Amino acid sequence: MALRACGLIIFRRRLIPKVDNTAIEFLLLQASNGIHHWTPPKGHVEPGESDLQTALRETQEEAGIDAGQLTIIEGFRKELNYVAWEKPKTVIYWLAEVKDYDVEVRLSREHQAYRWLGLDEACQLAQFKDMKAVLQEGHQFLCSMAA
């Protein structure tokens, strides 16, 4: 049976885009262990929890951002399937916007750093092809909403 995890692709919008036209910035966390990879907050589903409850709990635990500080974006839900630690794993992501651009990020011991990044930089740090694709799809979804 595949391990199941859920998370939120957290983003914020700059009121004034940077020179490279980056108006949307994604929050990535750097793991404290292994290859110190960068991902959005995510974690394993606990018994009795819904997938979205898991994503919200993990975001609070790993980044210190609680559900009241976020707006879940309707219509975007992506599922990744891959092998981690020699076991099949399924991870489900939703998009969530922080209500306060300057929200405080408080990392747990599971992570050693965080960064707010435009799409190109986020894709460079996200080492895994599937993670890059989800970030690109999320960005495209957000841009299509604004059009």
Swiss-Prot record:
Belongs to the Nudix hydrolase family. Its cofactor is a divalent metal cation. The modification N-acetylalanine is found at A2. Divalent metal ions. InterPro entries: NUDIX_hydrolase-like_dom_sf, NUDIX_hydrolase_CS, NUDIX_hydrolase_dom, Nudix_hydrolase_domain, Tetra_PHTase. GO terms for molecular function: bis(5'-nucleosyl)-tetraphosphatase (asymmetrical) activity; GTP binding. The keyword Nucleotide-binding applies. Residues 2-139 form the Nudix hydrolase domain. It catalyses: P(1),P(4)-bis(5'-guanosyl) tetraphosphate + H2O = GMP + GTP + 2 H(+); a 5'-end CoA-ribonucleoside in mRNA + H2O = a 5'-end phospho-adenosine-phospho-ribonucleoside in mRNA + (R)-4'-phosphopantetheine + 2 H(+); a 5'-end FAD-phospho-ribonucleoside in mRNA + H2O = a 5'-end phospho-adenosine-phospho-ribonucleoside in mRNA + FMN + 2 H(+). Its EC number is 3.6.1.17. A motif (Nudix box) lies at residues 43-64. Catalyzes the asymmetric hydrolysis of diadenosine 5',5'''-P1,P4-tetraphosphate (Ap4A) to yield AMP and ATP. Exhibits decapping activity towards FAD-capped RNAs and dpCoA-capped RNAs in vitro. This is Bis(5'-nucleosyl)-tetraphosphatase [asymmetrical]. One of its GO terms (biological process) is ATP biosynthetic process. Keywords: Acetylation, GTP-binding, Hydrolase, Nucleotide-binding. Pfam families: NUDIX (PF00293). Inhibited by fluoride ions. It comes from Sus scrofa (Pig).
